[in-house]
Design a protein with these regions (language model features):
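Elongated alpha-helical scaffolds
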Residues: 99-116, 331
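Long, low-complexity, Lys/Arg-enriched
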Residues: 1-98, 119-338
């Protein structure tokens, strides 16, 4: 693991830092984090003033426990300097790193820059953010100074991206992956959570992914079953969503509204699905289903079994032979072939 921390230039006082059931007394919160997290590498962001004031003291405390990397940064007094800090942090992180970010000290804009940098690095360098920690000196009480774990707030950026994809395209597979990862992470860190672990989130996430696959691959016959399964899994997971995945709570109604109409395979449902495909710009799926729907409609109109393969083949031949070139069938076939 790689710890990224900023050294401030202000006054440091000995305090007892408290994180869950762990405590550590020190003047430097970085020392507590190194003691708890045991990072192989610790990157310390240093302004010139911080180097002059505290660097030697901090270095002596850390050097026997972790490899120290000095990262000189400007004071952050201009937009150009803030971009320079962003670049410095990005350069300090390697492809695939697992990182912990300490935002206790430094300039006031550090938390914002940290979150944006993390979002960038997760996408570009595939880093894994293990922790974002803040030693809340202002919240000190008789038990010590609490350390807040702000990691879930960085995950908001992932939820934002997944929600945008769902809203724009109807694809909820990214949401499904995030939900499943929450349960996986909880079980990997079960010592911290005890017996209070999510048990329905993973099935809900898998059901979301299954519906998305059926929609995007136009597996229309599978949709009623997969959508009904999703609705059931959503009900089972609703309480856990509120506790473990708060960003998803606001989307639950939208998910149900988007997919619930596809719980049967009637012709009216398929017509609604064609409109859904067009609305979300899935033109190929829309035209493919529209062509099948025209066949189904004519068979249904004549009182024949529109699910029978033999009947469908015969109707397709009739439509192809008898309808005029400017007919709906012809237009759909032309667009589909394009």
């Amino acid at each position: 693991m790689k710890l990224i921390t900023a050294l401030g230039a202000g006054k440091y006082e000995p305090v007892t830092y408290r994180w869950n059931d762990r405590t550590y007394e020190t003047s430097f919160v970085q020392e507590a984090f190194v003691h708890w997290l045991k990072p192989e590498v610790t990157c310390v962001l240093l302004t010139e003033k911080a180097r002059e004031t505290h660097w030697n003291n901090l270095c002596q405390r850390l050097q026997e426990h972790t490899q120290i990397v000095e990262v000189d940064i400007p004071d952050g007094k201009s937009e150009a300097e803030l971009w320079r800090i962003f670049e410095k942090i990005s350069d300090a992180v390697c492809e695939g790193d697992q990182i912990a970010f300490d935002i206790t000290h430094g300039f006031r804009s550090l938390p914002v820059i940290a979150l944006l940098t993390i979002a960038y690095l997760k996408q570009i360098k595939q880093v894994k953010v293990r922790y974002i920690l803040y030693g809340a000196f202002d919240a000190k009480d008789e038990q010590g100074t609490p350390v807040f774990d702000l990691t879930p707030f960085a995950d908001l950026l992932d939820w934002l991206a997944a929600a945008k994809i769902f809203t724009a395209t109807g694809d909820s597979s990214e949401l499904g992956q995030l939900i499943q990862e929450i349960q996986n992470d909880a079980y990997r860190n079960r010592e911290a959570y005890g017996e209070n672990l999510p048990r329905a989130l993973k099935n809900f996430g898998a059901a979301l992914a299954e519906v998305s696959d059926d929609l995007l691959l136009a597996r229309v016959p599978n949709l009623p079953k997969s959508v009904s399964n999703l609705i059931e899994k959503q009900k089972q997971a609703s309480a856990e969503v509120s506790q473990w995945a708060p960003p998803l709570r606001l989307l639950l109604d939208k998910i149900a509204t988007a997919y619930a109409p596809f719980q049967d395979d009637s012709l009216s449902t398929q017509a609604a699905l064609i409109r859904w495909y067009f609305k979300h710009n899935h033109i190929m799926q829309a035209m493919t289903l529209a062509r099948e729907w025209v066949v189904s409609y004519h068979l249904h109109k004549e009182g024949r079994d529109w699910r029978s393969r033999k009947e469908r083949e015969q109707m397709e031949k009739r439509l192809g032979d008898s309808l005029q070139q400017d007919s709906l069938w012809s237009k759909i076939a032309e667009i589909r072939n394009d």
